[in-house]
Amino acid sequence: MCMDRLVESYPTGDPGDACRILGPIAIMQADLEEISEFGLQTSIFGRPTPISRLHHTVSSLHHFESGHWVSTYKSRPAAFFFTSGDFHSDQFNKAIAGRRDFVRSCRRGHAERNYSGFSLADGTIIWTLKYVPLAASRCLIFLRVIRMQKFSDQVKEMPRRERRVLETLLYALPFLLAQNLVPAILILKTKKNAVLRYLWIFWSVFVFYQWLQIPISHGESGTYVAKVGVQLFIVILQGFNLVLINPLDRDELLQTKVTGPRDDLLRQVYKVARLFTYLRGVRTPWQVKGIPSHPAYLELQPKTPISRSAFLVRQAAIVAWLYLYLNCANSLADRNSSPLSKPIYGLGYLRVSREEWRTRIMTSLMFWFAFLRAAVDIDYRTASILSVGVGLDAPEDWPPLFGRANQAYTLRNFWGTYWHQMFRWPFTATSNYLARELMALPRPSLLERYTNIFFVFLVSGVMHVMSDLLMGISMSQSASILFFCSMAVGVMIEDAVQAAWTRVSDSHRPGGASTVDSDGYAVPCWHKLVGFIWVCVWLSLTTPAWLCPLQMSKEKSLFLVNIPELVGTRKAIAITVGGGLLVKYTFRGEL
C-alpha cells in the first residue's frame, strides 16, 4: 500500500483526514520505488545506502491500541516503519506534495534532514537491513510498542519540545549503561590478558552501531542524540586504552586508590565507570595536564575541603546564567540575515568579500570563545551539580572545565590550556599507540612528535564526524576531519615560526612589559598580542568550513523554556548582562 492509495482509500481523499483517522502513519513506499527507478542512493542515518539493500513491500498493517501502527513484511525484513505521536496534517500534506523534492534531496545525501515528518517523538522510523534476523527486528518492535504504551498517557500531555527531549534521554539510558558498565566490570573481574577483554571491543562497537541506527532526530532532540553518540564513541577509545593497550585490573585500582578495600561491588563499578565518563582522570594517577585549579571563590571559603553547599550554589548560579546567555545567543542567531554562505577552500579565500570576512571572523571568535564554550560548560556544570548534590562525588572531583581565555595566544595553548581536556586521555593514548607501538617511530624525534599530534587531531575529527552523522550531516558534507587536521598543520607552522624567532633573537630575555604564563615563564605582552592575532586568523580561516554544514542543518532551539519569547529579546539581553555581572562579582566568575 503506497501513500497515494492510503489517502485515496478514505472518502474525502484528504491526507489530513487520513492522518487523523489512521493515526500518525505514513508509508513512503512510492518514494522508495521512484528512487530505485532512478538508480539513486538514499542517505540513511547520514550514510549513503544503496536502495537495493532495502525491501519495501508491505504485506499487512496491524493496528495496536492507542493509535499505534506497525507495518510488517512478507519475507526476511528489510525495513519496517513504526510511528507514534502527533503527525500534523500540514506535515502530511507537505510530505505528499514534496515527493519529488524528497527524491531530489536523496541525491544531495541528506534526505532525512529535509523530510521533517518523522522524528523520535512525532514518529519513529527504524530501518532493519537484510542481514538482521527477523526475530531481532520484531523484538525491537515489541519493546518500542511496550515502552510507548507505558509512557503514552504521561507523555502525550507534555508540550512537543519537552516530549522529544525526554524520549531521547529515556531511549539513550540503556545504551549508556551497556556501554559504560561492561568495560568497568571486565576491568574488575578479569585479568589483564583475558580473552573476554578482546571480545569486549566487538560489544562496544555493536552498541555504538545500534545507536547509529536510530532515526535522525529532528528539531530539539537532534543535539542530544549527537551528544549521546559522542559519549558512546569515546567509550570505545577509552576502553581500548584501559582494557587493552594500557590495561587496568582490580589490584592496580586498589594500589592507586581509585577503589577502596571496603567498597562494595556497586561502588567499585561506579568508580571504574567514571574513568569512561569523566575522562580527565581528576585525582587519579592518570590526571591529564592542563586542568585548571578551583576558582579563588571556593579556595577562600573557610571550610576545608571545599564546602559542598558553596560549590553547589556557585555552580547553580553559573548554570542559570549560561542558560540565559545561550537562550539569547540562539535567539539572535536565528535572526541573523547574513549567515556563512558556503565552505571556502584554497584560493577561494582570495575572492571573499570584506563583508563576508567580517562575518567569518566574528562568527569564528564568538563560536570558540563564547557560544561553544558555554554550550559545553553548561552540561559539565549540570552534571557536577547532580553528582555532588546526591553525594556521589566531592567538589574536588569537579574542577573547572575551561582555562583562562588570556592563555590562548598560541594554538598549543588554545587546545592544551584554554580548551577543555575531556578527551585528551583517550586521544593521546590512541595516538601514542599508533605512533610509538604500531609504527615504532623513534622517540624522541620530530617525526614522532608531529605524527603523534596529527593522530590526536585525526581521532578528534573522526569523533566529530560521528557527531555530524547523528546530526543528519552526511560524511561527504562533513568537514570535521579537514578542520581538526588543519589544527595539526597550524601547530607545525607555529612551532616553526617560534623556533626561527628563537634563533634570531634573545627571546628568553624579554624587555618591556611581560606577563607570566601558566608554566611560569615570562611572556612579553607583544608576543601575546601577536599570538592572539595568529590564533584568531587561523580559526577564522578554518572554522567556517566546519560550521557551514552545521548551520545548513537548521536545527531548532534546544531550550525547553525560551526566555526571549517570554519577556522579549531586549529584556532578555538586559537580564543576561545583569546576571553576568552579578555572577562575576558575587562568585568571582573567571573567563
From Swiss-Prot:
Spell out the subcellular localization from the entry: Membrane
Quick one: which pathway?
A: Secondary metabolite biosynthesis; terpenoid biosynthesis
Q: Major location, coarse class?
A: membrane
What's the EC number here? 2.3.1.-
The GO terms this record gives for MF are: O-acyltransferase activity
When the coding gene is removed by deletion, what phenotypic consequences does the entry describe? Impairs the production of the acetylated sartorypyrones A and G, but accumulates the unacetylated sartorypyrones D and F, respectively.
So where does this one cross the membrane?
123-143, 168-188, 199-219, 228-248, 309-329, 383-403, 453-473, 481-501, 529-549
Q: Which UniProt keywords apply?
A: Glycoprotein, Membrane, Transferase, Transmembrane, Transmembrane helix
Which residues carry attached sugars according to the database record?
Answer: N114
GO terms, biological process: lipid metabolic process
Q: Cite a GO CC annotation.
A: membrane
**Topology versus the membrane:** Multi-pass membrane protein
Q: Return the InterPro entries for the record.
A: Wax_synthase, Wax_synthase_dom
Its recorded reaction(s) are: sartorypyrone F + acetyl-CoA = sartorypyrone G + CoA; sartorypyrone D + acetyl-CoA = sartorypyrone A + CoA
Amino-acid biosynthesis as UniProt keyword: no
Task: Provide the function of this protein.
Answer: Acetyltransferase; part of the gene cluster that mediates the biosynthesis of meroterpenoids called sartorypyrones. SpyB catalyzes the last step of the pathway and is responsible for the acetylation of sartorypyrones D and F to produce sartorypyrones A and G, respectively. The biosynthesis of sartorypyrones begins with the production of triacetic acid lactone (TAL) by the NR-PKS spyA using one molecule of acetyl-CoA and two molecules of malonyl-CoA.
Spell out the family assignment given in the record's similarity comment. Answer: Belongs to the wax synthase family.
Q: PANTHER family, alphabetically?
A: LONG-CHAIN-ALCOHOL O-FATTY-ACYLTRANSFERASE 3-RELATED, WAX SYNTHASE DOMAIN-CONTAINING PROTEIN-RELATED
Q: What is this protein called?
A: Acetyltransferase spyB
The protein's organism comes out as: Aspergillus fumigatus (strain ATCC MYA-4609 / CBS 101355 / FGSC A1100 / Af293) (Neosartorya fumigata)
Q: What is the lineage of its organism?
A: Eukaryota, Fungi, Dikarya, Ascomycota, Pezizomycotina
Chain's gene name: spyB
